[in-house]
Amino acid sequence: MLTALKLKNIVLFESNELVFKKGFTTITGESGSGKSILFKSLDVLLGGQLSLSSSKNIQIGNDKSLIEGTFCLNNSLKNWLIDHEIDFDNGELLITKEWRFRENKIITRSRINGVMVNRKQILEIRPLLIDVTSQGVSNKIIPTEEKLFYIDKLTDKTIENL
């Protein structure tokens, strides 16, 4: 579960931190208030592509920009962290994506609990963290295998794929 999202120097957000509590969270606001920026930031944090040329995507400002997400640990995440030799002392998972601008170049770094990781590792851990389904997208709300698991669990019988 996502417990906090921090943005620094990302489009409208000079410095902003959202804290999420257990339960259902709704993000509402007028057009242009930054809702899409929040979701795009979360996507980029978890391995999504950042396009600096598109006005629909995040635009980086200042010399340094940062997106940081804090997540509760579950057993799957703990196992992943153990397999990748990443410490998890406090029961939380902290993912950080940082951009620095030097000599007309953009240097990006991603970290999990302070350890530098690559995009492949971020994409590997993404399904264990969050599943965002946006308006008009219904192709992957629940995978077929998971649907069958719940049906089997409700009926006490195994349903086979045809």
Whereabouts are the PLM-identified features?
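Gly/Lys-enriched N-terminal cap/neck module of very large, oligomeric protein machines
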Residues: 4-7, 11-162
